[in-house]
């Protein structure tokens, strides 16, 4: 079928991103990348480029180079806020990826009941504290399916991680027109 998906994990072993107790954004992002990549490869036979395997990932300057030639490129993150009750799903990108952002957000919302932030899950990459995110400017999507700072959302993610990742992978495959192999 010739479709290529790029999946990357935000942050790294040297930059943990947001932290809640012993849970680090970098680790959760790597888990999401690894699970979604495995489902897309094993169940749909799609070509998946990643910025690493297991607990490794590339620096952002190298990860953005993977985007070229991809049908969709997604970098996994978690959201965080000082307000521990902040919740919701958002995907940040340029307007050309608005539909993809909404597809991803709706898949997670359907699985979890979490609300969609922005325009049905889409936010421009210069929204809020952000300003022209490098990954989005290179053609990718920065996907934040939940708030690591919200204890309830974090607990739900940890207990339903595989189901959430399955929903994301199935939505990607459906949007690309891929069928199970």
What are these regions (language model features)?
Residues 46-53, 115-122, 180-181:
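Surface-exposed patches in mature extracellular/periplasmic domains of secreted proteins
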Residues 2-89, 94-99:
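Catalytic-core regions of hydrolytic enzymes
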């Amino acid at each position: 079928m010739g479709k290529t998906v790029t999946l990357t994990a935000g942050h790294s072993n040297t930059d943990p991103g947001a932290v809640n107790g012993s849970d680090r954004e970098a680790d959760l992002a790597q888990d999401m990348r690894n699970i979604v990549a495995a489902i897309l490869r094993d169940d749909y036979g799609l070509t998946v480029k990643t910025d690493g395997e297991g607990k490794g990932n590339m620096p952002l300057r190298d990860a953005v180079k993977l985007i070229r030639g991809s049908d969709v490129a997604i970098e996994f993150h978690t959201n965080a806020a000082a307000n521990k009750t902040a919740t919701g799903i958002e995907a940040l990108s340029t307007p050309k990826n608005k539909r993809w952002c909404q597809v991803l957000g709706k898949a997670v919302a359907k699985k979890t009941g979490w609300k969609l932030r922005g325009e049905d899950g889409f936010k421009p990459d210069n929204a809020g504290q952000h300003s022209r995110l490098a990954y989005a400017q290179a053609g990718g999507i920065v996907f934040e399916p939940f708030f690591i700072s919200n204890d309830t959302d974090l607990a739900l993610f940890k207990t339903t991680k595989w189901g959430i990742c399955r929903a994301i992978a199935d939505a990607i495959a459906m949007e690309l027109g891929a069928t199970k192999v």
